[in-house]
Amino acid sequence: MAKGYKKDEIINKLENLKDISTLYKEDFINYRGYTIDTKEKYTEVIAEWLIKNFNLFDNIKKITRQSSYKVDTHDGKHNNQNSNRLEEIMAIEIFNQKSLNILGKVLDYQTPLKNERDDKAGKIDIVSYNKDIKTVYLLELKKEDNEETMLRCVLEIFTYSKTLDKDKFLEDFNLSKDTKIKASPLVFFNSFQHKEMVEGDNKFLKQLMDKLDIEPFYITKNSNYYAII
């Protein structure tokens, strides 16, 4: 991001947004730094505005997938070493290790949300289930050197969770209807997102995360084993 922006310019971008379900894809969600007039973090300006306009999230449309959310052909194998698909490969590695400590058993990876080709929806990187607390986790995985803002990660996985037909999802995974569904970013310990949360002033981002019921988890990798810390 070469140029700086005033607070009103950032708010104007938000007010001109046509589709809240694609907000997480907007370039300005990843702006790092401070407004040139009020010296507020760009992410804080955005988070505060979203808190004040929280009802906009109700406009995210649920997509009911006619095919199963659980993809039977997901066998834990991949043939593509393309670095652009590193997060997908990592998700498969986590699937193959079967569990993710406090997040429970890993049920699937790259879980599709689209029903039709033109649907504006991505894929859930990892689905896990902790049977002790009857909670299924929808996890948005980011590779270690990813430099997206935590705000972007939060908005992405929250949008996916709102898009999901939760009743059908639970049925497809043979989970009881009273299973709690929790959406979370899954980022590396000491990553940009982790440092952003522990080192900076993120009052409004944290308030937004509380309202969205989004909690990030931090992951490490040792000897090809992934663990939550």
Annotated model-derived regions:
Residues 1-229:
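Charged, terminal alpha-helix-loop-beta segments
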